[in-house]
């Protein structure tokens, strides 16, 4: 919005030309989202407390979590608000990639909101019925994936980028839709599963979004895309603005979500952020890179799958409790230790993922 306005005002004052620079807009996008989150935080927490929108804690969970019962949840609303406002202010409104991310972000946010509403208002610990949750998540993911396939069919936008192999970029055909579906829905659920400790999900999300900001910048620059042997996608550059907005909003939320948390993001935040990371990976053709950089989310999800599978097949559990962060809690690790160590692992994985762009 401001970019469009600046383009009309630059003829009156050349200083408005700074709005055309991607690096400038990326920085102010981050700062805008950060300040909105910090401003909304105390007000959102007070409002949620007044409405008695408190966290529902499982009785079979770690005893250390019982003290979290009643802590305001659905704080993801402030994350989404900060991201959407910042993106609308600083990104080019004509960019289709930006709108793809916003559709998934807002759509998954609405699904998460309904899920949280069932938990905190109707006191239903299971939340929204699973089949309906996955149905609407699938509708959004398949709708966006199908639209992208129709527009980008047989172009670099539907190629698969394989790490370590610079000349291996097969056209996916209709498999593009299926892959995109699993990436978007899978990442949404993976971040949701990871969101079980104070700050555990938001910081890896910030790290991955920051990594994708660099990838988006390179993908949208023909010279760097050719240098790194990745597809050049002319709309990808504006995803830098989206990614930095996620970073800013996430850091602002972390101010209130760090241990001991004053507010939790709830499904409205975790599903939306996960879906956003998934669609960003799809748009940048970096699904494999998401698996590497988002390794913490992958491990958390696999721990649940393995735990359920083992119990059904063998009647035995692999972990003391899943997702795996609860396993370490039950082993006696203090919650802050689990959180910070997972943060460190996440940062290392993002750096490793970025390194794979050059190792080809």
Curated annotation (Swiss-Prot):
Residues 47-71, 115-131, 189-198, 257-262, 309-337 are cytoplasmic. It is found in: Cell inner membrane. Catalyzes the initial step of the lipid cycle reactions in the biosynthesis of the cell wall peptidoglycan: transfers peptidoglycan precursor phospho-MurNAc-pentapeptide from UDP-MurNAc-pentapeptide onto the lipid carrier undecaprenyl phosphate, yielding undecaprenyl-pyrophosphoryl-MurNAc-pentapeptide, known as lipid I. InterPro entries: Glycosyl_transferase_4, PNAcMuramoyl-5peptid_Trfase, PNAcMuramoyl-5peptid_Trfase_CS. This is Phospho-N-acetylmuramoyl-pentapeptide-transferase. Belongs to the glycosyltransferase 4 family. MraY subfamily. GO terms for molecular function: metal ion binding; phospho-N-acetylmuramoyl-pentapeptide-transferase activity; UDP-N-acetylmuramoyl-L-alanyl-D-glutamyl-meso-2,6-diaminopimelyl-D-alanyl-D-alanine:undecaprenyl-phosphate transferase activity. Its EC number is 2.7.8.13. It comes from the Bacteria. PROSITE patterns: MRAY_1, MRAY_2. Disulfide bonds: none annotated.
């Amino acid at each position: 919005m401001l970019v469009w306005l600046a383009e009309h005002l630059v003829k009156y004052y050349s200083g408005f030309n700074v709005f055309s620079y991607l690096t400038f807009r990326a920085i102010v996008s981050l700062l805008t989202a950060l300040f909105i989150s910090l401003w909304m935080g105390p007000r959102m927490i007070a409002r949620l407390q007044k409405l008695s929108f408190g966290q529902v804690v499982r009785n079979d969970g770690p005893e250390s979590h019982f003290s979290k019962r009643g802590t305001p949840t659905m704080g993801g609303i402030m994350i989404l608000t900060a991201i959407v406002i910042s993106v609308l202010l600083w990104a080019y409104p004509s960019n289709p990639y930006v709108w793809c991310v916003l559709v998934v972000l807002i759509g998954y946010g609405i699904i998460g909101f309904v899920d949280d509403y069932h938990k905190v208002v109707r006191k239903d610990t299971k939340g929204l019925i699973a089949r309906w949750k996955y149905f609407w998540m699938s509708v959004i993911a398949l709708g966006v994936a199908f639209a992208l396939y129709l527009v980008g069919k047989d172009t670099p936008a539907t190629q698969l980028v394989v790490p370590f192999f610079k000349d291996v970029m097969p056209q996916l055909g209709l498999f593009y839709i299926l892959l995109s579906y699993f990436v978007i829905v899978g990442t949404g659920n993976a971040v949701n599963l990871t969101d079980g400790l104070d700050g555990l999900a938001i910081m890896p999300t910030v790290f991955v979004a920051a990594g994708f900001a660099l990838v988006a910048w390179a993908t949208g620059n023909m010279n760097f895309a050719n240098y790194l042997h990745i597809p050049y996608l002319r709309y990808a550059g504006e995803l830098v603005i989206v990614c930095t907005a996620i970073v800013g909003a996430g850091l602002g939320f972390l101010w209130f979500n760090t241990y001991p948390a004053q507010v939790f993001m709830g499904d409205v935040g975790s599903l939306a952020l996960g879906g956003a990371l998934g669609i960003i990976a799809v748009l940048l053709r970096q699904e494999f890179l998401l698996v590497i950089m988002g390794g913490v989310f992958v491990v958390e999800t696999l721990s649940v799958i393995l735990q359920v599978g083992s119990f059904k097949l063998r009647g035995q559990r692999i972990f003391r409790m899943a997702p795996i962060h609860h396993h370490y809690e039950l082993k006696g690790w203090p919650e802050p230790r689990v959180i910070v160590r997972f943060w460190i692992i996440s940062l290392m994985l993002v750096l490793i993922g970025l390194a794979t762009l050059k190792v080809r």
